[in-house]
Design a protein with these regions (language model features):
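Short, structured loop/turn "capping" segments at alpha-beta junctions
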Residues: 113-115, 142-143
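A glycine-rich beta-turn/hairpin centered on an aromatic-Pro dipeptide
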Residues: 146-149, 153
Length: 213
């Protein structure tokens, strides 16, 4: 069986010493995906016909990558909105990372809160897995990295989304999953800590069809 192709979104930024805007992705992502048998397909932000592009590349799922905040870049916001519309229509697994999880939550009419807790910024911490299906391969607690200033709570959670992971110190939401679509998001960065749990959750989301039954 051939490896699955996974579309992955890109952050934008200015290249130093060049007068041009570029799409960018951390180099941590390709080796992690390669290790678990996934082929990354980069999704540019500047296309006018995004839906047509998504049809033609024929990927098996999507990763909404991290970096910056929802609302900072209208082009990227629009690209990821189109991806979510496409993945819902085609029932393709989608995995949101940090900003990507926030984009999923916003898409389903949720919101994010500016965190006042310094434990969320650049500090690893323990999270509790509160979903039985994910407990089967992640266990009841795992340690994750943390680079985000925004948080989600039960009051800010989007429609048809449910929490599957919460922090052990303030019960803010670190992981969400859609109730009836193959859509999941995490606030930590699996690519920055490519350990067993990071590989397991990605491989399960994209390669285990039974997980979404």
């Amino acid at each position: 069986m051939s490896n699955k192709k996974i579309g992955i979104t890109l952050r934008t930024g200015n290249a130093s010493n060049y007068n041009e805007q570029r799409d960018m992705l951390s180099q941590d992502w390709p080796p992690l995906l390669e290790k678990i048998g996934l082929i990354p397909i980069f999704i540019p932000n500047s296309l006018e016909k995004i839906s047509q592009f998504l049809e033609e590349i024929e990927v098996d799922g999507f990763i909404l990558s991290g970096g910056d905040n929802v609302g900072d870049d209208p082009l990227r916001d629009n690209t990821e909105k189109k991806i979510l519309e496409y993945t819902i229509a085609h029932d393709l697994p989608t995995f949101g990372v940090c900003r990507g999880m926030q984009a999923i939550n916003n898409f389903f009419n949720g919101s994010v809160i500016d965190s006042k807790n310094s434990k969320h910024v650049d500090k690893p911490h323990i999270i509790k897995i509160v979903n039985e299906k994910l407990q089967q391969f992640l266990g009841k607690t795992i340690q994750v990295n943390s680079y985000h200033n925004n948080t989600l709570t039960s009051k800010s959670l989007g429609e048809n989304l449910q929490e599957f992971a919460i922090t052990d110190f303030d019960n803010t939401i670190e992981g969400i999953i859609h109730k009836n679509k193959p859509i999941i998001g995490v606030m930590w960065h699996p690519e920055r800590t490519p350990n067993k749990e990071s590989q397991l959750i990605l491989k399960t989301v994209f390669c285990d069809k039974d997980f979404w039954k």
